[in-house]
Amino acid sequence: MEEKEVVPTLKRPRKNLNLEAVVLVNGHGGNVPIKDYLIDIENELGLKIIFNNSIVEIEGPHAGTGELSMGMVLGIADESRLNEHCHFEKYPEVGMVGLQEARQQNKGIDDGACQVENEGVSVDLELGKTLLEKATRNIVKDVQSLLE
């Protein structure tokens, strides 16, 4: 999501609900750069914004074991397709394994890709539950900080 998309997305609820603050819960690593624009967005809207990146920070490699395990706990992943998931030629975005330019430009992406290449991807329901609980606790803390 880009800055130009965030402002209109928040403008109507800000006005209609008379919001003073929001917690934006990010679930996609590609949205992290929006943090660079939060002060401008806050000033434009007169709205306090907390950017919660817990899910992205704790899930591990993109489409890897952590993300897939959380998806299974939430009921949005299909375990029967797990074998197909690790065909990196067909799905280069899994773990970012096949995205060479991204791997060359970002050590964190390359580290995650190496992890997926070496360990593969699996479903671990306990891990998924633990990650979701941790993310939820962090989100609740952010909401509580707005209420203080």
Language model features by range: what are they?
Residues 1-21, 27-148:
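Extended, histidine- and acidic-residue-enriched regions that form the cofactor-binding/catalytic faces
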